[in-house]
A protein has these predicted regions:
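Phosphate/adenylate-binding "loop-and-lid" substructures adjacent to NTP/NAD/dNTP-binding pockets
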Residues: 30, 34-74
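Electropositive, glycine- and tryptophan-enriched low-complexity nucleic-acid-binding patches
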Residues: 91-92, 96-109
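Non-catalytic, peripheral interaction segments enriched in hydrophobic/basic residues
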Residues: 317-363, 367, 371
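Core structural elements
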Residues: 64-68, 73, 175, 315-332
Length: 427
């Protein structure tokens, strides 16, 4: 494919219109100039021709990204770089033209940030490899990958495919556009900031070199962005692969392997893309399930959504719970979790009973509502005036009967087990 005149494809009306719609659809925060995504259309109507001419003549200068620090579950910090909405628009237009070119080069076992690919496909591929006798895992952790990408190495790799100097120029400009941290400018000497529309593609272009090396060595692997695992048949092979691939990553790609987090392990000790793995002796196969840390995060969020002090209606809590439940099940539906869903359903009902009990407020109102729900008068008044804590009362048999599973379902609450069974079919 001729890649010597890509800038005109990038600046075509059709491509720019698609980029505009995508940026507006994605919404997103303001960059350093404070412009909102809702203002992009008016801005382009006034300045679009000037921007296009600047891109053609290599005079366009991207603005620095705005640094945003996001806490990680392990206590660390993930640095995001928020470009201006104009730069997001230009990056999106570039990515739309470059992506089909690189899709022809990317490895079939690369699943992150690619069209029509997802984390679930990566998990299913990994399971196939594990169940084919490759049950020793090389789990390689790249230390601050997006913050440490070597610009020269990346541009050299891009230059092997892209021959349009205008495109090469603007991509490099985005890499070195700088970072604003609390109104202080900082040069971006290395890295491709997470948050830009080009960053996922650039990450895959860099790490495709790793994919090619692993393919050349005949290794079984799956990669989702910078999260890569390799599956081999023995512990000795796994340790050898860990040494050799780590050396390649650091010496050839200029990246850093976090040897503290990288490890050789069996599937049972692996956490990958939120999934854990276990061996099912009934079918003599490894299977996936939500990892214990993913379950803990679910429970934490579920408690937040059913917090008794959250000053919203119970119907609103149920609505938000349902959204969260559906999203979580849709992500983990390829895993085995019927028993887990039953347990979590019980936890959710228990939390909602506490919310409803608090919502009734006074003992008199509680007794009145219990009687409406067919609790005998003597039991209703005994429970309403007993003074027990919410947590204990939520386990009370009469309250469980009054605020039953059937009644909570009639309020619109989604059953995790039912939704999981419906989404995963016969699993």
């Amino acid at each position: 494919m001729d890649t010597s005149s890509l800038m005109e494809q990038i600046l075509s009306s059709d491509n720019l219109n698609i980029a505009y719609l995508q940026v507006v659809r994605n919404k997103g925060a303001e960059g350093v100039d404070g412009m909102k995504y809702t203002e992009l259309g008016e801005h382009l109507a006034k300045n679009g021709k000037i921007i296009k001419e600047q891109l053609r003549t290599r005079k366009y200068k991207p603005q620095p990204v705005r640094r945003v620090e996001i806490p990680k579950p392990d206590g660390g910090i993930r640095n995001l770089g928020v470009p201006t909405v104009t730069d997001r628009f230009i990056q999106q237009a570039i990515a739309q033209v470059l992506t089909p070119i690189y899709e022809e080069q990317f490895h079939d076992h690369s699943y992150g940030f690619r069209p029509n690919r997802c984390a679930q496909q990566a998990i299913l591929t990994a399971l196939d490899m594990m169940n084919d006798g490759n049950d020793w895992i090389v789990d390689i952790d790249l230390e601050k990958f997006f913050d440490t990408v070597n610009h020269d190495k990346l541009m050299t790799i891009i230059g092997r495919t892209i021959k349009d100097g205008d495109v090469i120029s603007i991509v490099r400009k985005y890499l070195v556009s700088g970072i604003m941290i609390d109104d202080e400018y900082e040069d971006s000497i290395v890295g491709t900031p997470q948050g830009g529309n080009l960053s996922p593609l650039l990450a895959n272009i860099m790490l495709n070199e790793l994919d090619k090396e692993m393919e050349k060595r005949g290794l079984n692997f799956v990669r989702y962005a910078d999260d890569c695992i390799i599956m081999v048949g023995s512990e000795m092979s796994a340790n050898r692969v860990m040494r050799n691939i780590s050396r390649f990553i650091e010496e050839k790609l200029g990246l850093k392997v976090n040897m503290t987090k990288s490890k050789v392990d069996r599937p049972r000790g692996l956490k990958y893309l939120g999934f854990g793995f276990y061996f099912d002796p009934r079918v003599h196969q490894f299977k996936a399930k939500p990892h214990a840390k993913s379950v803990a995060k679910f429970k934490k969020r579920m408690k937040e959504l059913t917090c008794r002090s959250w000053g919203v209606s119970n119907s609103y809590k149920v609505e938000k719970l349902n959204q969260f439940i559906r999203g979580w099940i849709n992500y983990f539906k390829i895993g085995s979790m019927k028993t887990l869903c039953r347990e979590l359903d019980g936890n959710i009902r228990y939390r909602l009973r506490m919310c409803i009990w608090k919502h009734w407020k006074t003992p008199q109102n509680r007794a009145k509502n219990l009687m409406k729900l067919d609790v005998p008068r003597w039991a209703a008044f005994k429970i309403a005036y007993c003074g027990d804590r919410y947590a204990r009362l939520a386990h009370n048999g009469w309250i469980q009967k009054a605020i039953s599973t059937k009644r909570l379902t009639s309020f619109g609450l989604v059953s995790m087990l039912d939704y999981y069974t419906e989404r995963c079919g016969t699993c």
